[in-house]
A protein has these predicted regions:
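Conserved alpha/beta core of the MobA/IspD/sugar-nucleotide pyrophosphorylase nucleotidyltransferase superfamily
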Residues: 142, 160-209
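Acidic metal-phosphate-binding loop of nucleotide-sugar-dependent transferases
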Residues: 74-75, 101-103
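Short alpha-helix within the catalytic core of nucleotide-sugar-dependent glycosyltransferases
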Residues: 34, 91, 106-117, 144, ...
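N-terminal glycine-rich phosphate-binding loop and ensuing alpha1 helix
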Residues: 1-49
């Protein structure tokens, strides 16, 4: 099974509470989940947030919407991902997504999942050393066994926070594959980190809804 894990928290330093910001009448994270639901390969979507009180409103909102939630360490996000896999598996493939990307593209997700399947890679992504997709369309696909190996071995705080560096920094150990497009849009910004980013995606959603 392919398990999508949507990483989310309320305590963003640059734009606190952004994942629950209103986007065309619904929380931004639920708008993103609507788009993820259009990716057929994602058999299940789980929101992975922290066990801190600051994330209680997020967890309660997801539960009210019928979205599965796993809660774990705020800083050890890698451990949180393993916990989500254990709680909502069995899953042999995981997909890492972050909840600040309400313009997520189901087609890009499907292509990256298919690339990992076709190559048998331990890790596949549409970013990396050469980014061609806009920031905000990022998707990472990994074998659950590879991520378990990372979680069992690394104690580096950077690896624990950012989940996958232990994999893509070891190309001699883990098989990697990268999805690129012909047109280079790597400098385009569709993610939501700042107030102006939120204004932009609100304008997009208002135009479409």
């Amino acid at each position: 099974m392919v398990l999508a894990i949507l990483q989310a928290r309320m305590s963003s330093t640059r734009l606190p509470g952004k994942v629950m910001a209103d986007l065309a009448g619904a929380p931004m994270i639920l708008r993103q989940i609507e788009r993820l639901d259009r990716a057929p390969s994602l058999r299940r979507i789980v929101v992975a947030t922290s066990d801190q009180p600051s994330d209680d409103p997020l967890a309660h909102a997801m539960q009210a919407a019928g979205v599965p939630v796993f809660r774990g360490s705020l800083d050890d996000v890698l451990g949180r991902f393993i916990g989500a896999i254990d709680a909502f598996g069995p899953a042999d493939i995981g997909v890492r997504l972050t909840a600040d990307c309400p313009l997520a593209d189901p087609g890009v997700i499907e292509a990256t999942v298919a690339l990992r399947e076709a190559t048998g890679a331990d890790y596949a992504a549409n970013a990396g050393e050469r980014r061609t997709f806009p920031k905000g369309l990022d998707v990472e696909v990994f074998r659950a066994a590879a991520l378990r190996a990372a979680a069992g071995e690394t104690r580096d705080p950077y690896d624990r926070e950012h989940v996958t560096p232990f994999l893509y920094r070891r190309p001699k150990r883990f098989a990697l594959a990268f999805h690129h497009q012909a047109v280079d849009e790597g400098e385009v910004r569709w993610t939501v980190d700042r107030p102006d980013d939120l204004e932009f995606v609100r304008a997009v959603y208002d135009a479409l809804y």
